Structure formats: structure tokens, C-alpha cells
């Protein structure tokens, strides 16, 4: 789930429902959408499926579900097919509910991202390829704070001046949306004030990002491409 205030309740209901049908469920708590997909393809025993509770960049009082398997995310047509199939299922006695497990998958995922960066940069200081770079992150109080604290910092980057890394489900500072003018103005201000080498801003569930260059040039939407 992302940081929305309704996230714990909705994810709890989803886990309860899956568990009641005999599924072995694991609660990742605060997570990103890309991480939820990656849990279906990473590790010795990938998960059969994953559900992300998020409404992406929409206001804090919205929420929804994103479904993933190792084949990717379910689209609207997939959801319609599932709902149609559900109408044909004859209710049966549910098996004994399974206990929900807890896992800090975001630390595993962050280590995976850091490893990819180390292998890609191939710096002389393999463990700290970003040493000497000042990179500020604006997570908008969504789920993206981990990227600064668990990816960039261990790689040697200076993340001082990063903003709104702590999750807050009412988004008190700005909408976590790299397409929003106020959000981009926030990360641009951070880059210029800190004289940073790069600024990165994420949406709430961290599947979209924007960037700001040292001179304040914004790279988001089509400009990012």
C-alpha cells in the first residue's frame, strides 16, 4: 500500500479476504507499485500474485487496487473477466484461514535497485558509485522516501535537503505527482537552494518520476523522454 490514510484498512480487508479462502498472504505494509510487481519475479520463491493498494497521484481521499502476476499488471478487461467468472462460482465452505505473514520487502527491493546501479555504473568505488553527487528527493509524503534513504544514501550520494520523505497519508505539502506544477516547483526549489546535482520527484506509489537539473530545468512528462 501507499501512504494514504485508508491504506491500512483496505489492505487489511484484502488480506482477510484472501486468507479466508486459504491463500498464504504476506503484508508488506508501505511499499511501491514497482516493488509489488517485482515480488512476483524476484527471489527463490516469487509470489504468485500481488495487490497494491493505491490511487496513484489522485487526492488522498481516493484509493484502489492494482493486481499483478509475473506476467504483468491486470488491465480493465482482465478485471471484468474475473468479475464475470466470480458470478459463476458456487459458494463453498471456506478452508481454515491462514495467518498473515509480515515482511520488509522494501529493504530487499531497495538492495536490488542499489545492486543494479552499482553494476551499471561500474565505478572504481564499486560500493559507492554516487559518492560526490548531491541528489535531493521529493517523495511528497508518499511511499518514495525509501529511494533516498535505502538506495541513494548507501550508494554514497548526499541526500541532504531532500523533502517530504516521511509518509503522510493526507499529503500536507503538495500532491505527489510529477505532472503537477506545484510539485515540480517544490523539487526545483530544493535543487536550487541546495545547489544539488539532481532532483528526483515521485508520485505516491513510485511508478512515475520527474527530475530537475542543476540549473533548474524540469524534466517531466514528455520532456523526461
Question: Where is each model-derived feature located?
Answer:
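Glycine-rich phosphate-binding loop of actin/hexokinase-like ATP-binding domains
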Residues: 51, 67-82, 206-225
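Short beta-strands and strand-loop turn motifs
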Residues: 1, 93-97, 210
Amino acid at each position: 500500500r501507499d501512504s494514504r490514510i485508508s491504506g491500512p484498512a483496505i489492505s487489511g480487508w484484502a488480506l482477510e479476504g484472501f486468507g479466508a479462502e486459504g491463500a498464504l498472504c504476506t503484508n508488506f505494509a508501505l511499499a511501491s507499485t514497482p516493488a509489488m510487481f517485482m515480488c512476483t519475479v524476484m527471489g527463490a520463491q516469487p509470489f504468485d500474485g500481488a495487490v497494491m493498494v493505491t490511487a496513484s497521484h489522485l487526492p488522498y481521499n481516493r484509493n484502489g487496487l492494482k493486481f499483478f502476476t509475473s506476467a504483468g499488471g491486470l488491465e480493465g478487461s482482465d478485471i471484468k473477466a474475473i468479475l464475470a467468472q466470480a458470478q459463476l462460482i458456487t459458494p463453498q465452505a471456506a478452508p481454515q484461514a491462514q495467518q498473515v505473514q509480515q515482511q520488509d520487502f522494501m529493504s530487499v527491493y531497495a538492495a536490488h535497485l542499489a545492486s543494479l546501479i552499482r553494476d551499471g555504473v561500474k565505478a572504481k568505488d564499486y560500493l559507492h558509485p554516487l559518492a560526490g553527487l548531491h541528489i535531493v528527493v521529493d517523495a511528497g509524503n508518499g511511499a518514495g522516501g525509501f529511494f533516498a534513504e535505502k538506495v541513494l544514501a548507501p550508494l554514497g550520494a548526499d541526500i541532504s535537503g531532500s523533502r517530504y520523505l516521511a509518509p503522510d497519508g493526507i499529503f500536507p505539502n503538495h500532491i505527489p505527482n510529477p505532472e503537477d506544477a506545484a510539485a515540480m516547483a517544490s523539487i526545483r526549489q530544493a535543487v536550487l537552494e541546495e545547489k544539488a546535482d539532481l532532483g528526483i520527484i515521485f508520485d505516491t506509489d513510485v511508478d512515475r518520476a520527474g527530475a530537475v537539473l542543476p540549473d533548474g530545468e524540469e524534466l517531466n512528462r514528455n520532456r523526461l523522454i
